[in-house]
């Protein structure tokens, strides 16, 4: 035992010293160099039709089945602005504290890609929909006990633009195929100032933006479907010096990948500068297999996109004054502002009164989880937030992971999950029964929890007289264990509780069982 303790203490000291050395090295590197990260985010607007045509926006439809004549640039077709897209853009800009421009302009951005049939993209460059916004978010430092700090990032502008098609590369045939289903889908482009300093901050910003967009219903934020695409501009400089030469990171498929890609690029650039080299202005792609960034193309010259006003679209006028009559029936910004729901920052402030910081960090670690949790509380004002969060994370999600299911399954079966939570809060069932019920949900999704409990008689046994009889019987039939317990072997106590759980088929109120067992043994 003494040898074990010495080895254990040695291991603790070793890791403590290693951690200190690593921290000193990391802090000194960070003091010497200052990373600057700016994000450009494209979010597909959740509408049924495209930005300038009546073409549908369905993701899973067969290739080239959602293409209107305008989308494939048939000569003579004209753009017609989708009002719903403008309203979604204004609502998003208001949620991000932006200044809405009363007049914005559409322009043509010329470049040739095979999946851009017109040879130009209709966008907003010089006079966008909104400018000068800000997003606040919490950044959680990695570790067992997640500490957070507050951060904000400035939004330079939000602009509306149309998406391009997709190029599908067939290696077997040795050719590229074009799918124009995505061409013309409405986008909001968010251009952020380079005021972030790490991959963790960038990931936290995107996560917060996803929460806001999903709460507003303006974007699904499904990165796996391309509904949200993030590019990162990374540069390294000395503190208080001008920004260094930047590299642009693309091909980032998830929030986690964004964090890793930026952290890798920061280390790569620092390594180049420490060796006396020079960072090249280039576009790099994140390789998720090798966990590194690879060269896509060098940016030797600045592209001349030949921006020009879109001749087929008039300026976009909005009604922005509150107490002035809207004579021309323009999109009314003040009325849209009144439709804003409670935003994540305010929801977190409210939840902080009911949740511990660790639980709040766990609940807000995933966009889908946070939205589902908010909906569960919204549908039942009587529900205890701390209990709901703990049960959902420790019990429900554990069973989902066991069956290789994701949160979509919980979203689709939200009523079932809510009834489960209500049964346990009302002390109708206990936690082991909750686990059994979640397993039953996966096997038989048509039955509701209360019905299953009634059929199997899984009600929690909480009657003290009944529990005392069970505890007395256990002690009576196990005299040897009682003798060992009274002799000082306190670990045997768990065996008594285990036997009580077996006798009651995991339906006993184990808090009461523990109290009764302790009283009887003393």
Where are these regions (language model features)?
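Amphipathic alpha-helical core segments of compact helical bundles
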Residues: 46, 267, 393-401, 439-443, ...
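Core structural elements
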Residues: 225-238, 350-375, 385-403, 415, ...
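Strongly charged, low-complexity linkers/loops
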Residues: 407-418, 428-503
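Residue-level detector of well-ordered alpha-helical segments, enriched
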Residues: 359, 372, 384-392, 416, ...
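N-terminal mitochondrial targeting presequence
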Residues: 1-32
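Short, amphipathic C-terminal "tail helix"
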Residues: 490-522
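Basic, nucleic-acid-interacting segments
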Residues: 26-342, 348, 354-358, 379-385, ...
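M16/insulysin-pitrilysin zinc metalloprotease superfamily fold
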Residues: 382-388, 396-410, 419, 423-424, ...
């Amino acid at each position: 035992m003494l040898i074990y303790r010495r080895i254990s203490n040695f291991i603790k000291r070793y890791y403590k010293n290693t951690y200190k050395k690593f921290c000193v090295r990391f802090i000194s590197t960070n003091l010497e160099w200052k990373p600057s990260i700016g994000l450009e985010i494209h979010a597909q607007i959740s509408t049924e039709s495209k930005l300038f045509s009546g073409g549908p926006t369905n993701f899973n439809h067969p290739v080239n089945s959602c293409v209107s004549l305008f989308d494939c640039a048939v000569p003579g077709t004209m753009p017609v602005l989708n009002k719903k897209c403008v309203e979604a853009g204004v609502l998003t800009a208001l949620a991000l504290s932006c200044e809405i421009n009363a007049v914005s302009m559409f322009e043509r951005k010329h470049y040739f890609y095979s999946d851009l049939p017109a040879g130009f993209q209709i966008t907003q460059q010089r006079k966008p929909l909104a400018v000068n916004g800000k997003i606040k978010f919490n950044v959680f430092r990695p570790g067992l006990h997640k500490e957070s700090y507050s951060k904000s990032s400035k939004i330079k502008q939000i602009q509306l633009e149309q998406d391009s098609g997709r190029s599908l590369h067939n290696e077997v045939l040795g050719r590229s195929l074009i799918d124009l289903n995505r061409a013309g889908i409405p986008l909001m482009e968010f251009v952020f100032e380079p005021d972030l300093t790490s991959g963790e901050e960038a990931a936290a910003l995107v996560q917060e933006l996803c929460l806001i967009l999903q709460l507003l219903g303006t974007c699904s934020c499904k990165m796996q479907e391309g509904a949200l695409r993030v590019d990162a501009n990374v540069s390294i400089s000395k503190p208080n010096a001008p920004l260094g030469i930047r590299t642009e990171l693309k091909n980032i498929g998830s929030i986690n990948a964004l964090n890793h890609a930026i952290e890798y690029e920061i280390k790569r650039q620092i390594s180049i500068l420490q060796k006396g080299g020079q960072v090249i202005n280039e576009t790099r792609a994140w390789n998720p297999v090798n966990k590194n960034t690879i060269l896509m193309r060098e940016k030797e010259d600045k592209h001349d996109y030949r921006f020009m006003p879109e001749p087929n679209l008039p300026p976009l006028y909005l009604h922005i004054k509150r107490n002035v009559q809207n004579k021309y029936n323009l999109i009314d910004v003040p009325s849209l502002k009144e439709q804003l729901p409670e935003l994540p920052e305010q929801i977190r402030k409210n939840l902080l009164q009911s949740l511990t910081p660790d639980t709040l960090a766990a609940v807000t670690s995933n966009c889908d989880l946070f939205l589902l949790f908010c909906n569960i509380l919204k549908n039942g004002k009587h529900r205890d937030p701390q209990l709901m969060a703990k049960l959902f994370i420790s019990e429900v999600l554990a069973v989902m992971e066991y069956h290789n299911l994701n949160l979509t399954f919980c979203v689709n079966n939200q009523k079932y999950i809510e009834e489960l939570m209500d049964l346990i809060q009302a002390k109708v069932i206990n936690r082991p029964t909750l686990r059994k019920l979640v397993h039953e949900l996966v096997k038989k999704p048509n039955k509701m929890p209360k019905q299953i409990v009634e059929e199997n008689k899984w009600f929690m046994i909480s009657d003290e007289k009944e529990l005392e009889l069970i505890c007395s019987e256990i002690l009576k039939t196990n005299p040897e264990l009682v003798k060992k317990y009274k002799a000082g072997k306190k670990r045997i106590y768990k065996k008594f509780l285990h036997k009580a759980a077996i006798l009651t088929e995991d339906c006993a109120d184990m808090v009461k069982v523990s109290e009764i067992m302790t009283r009887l043994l003393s």
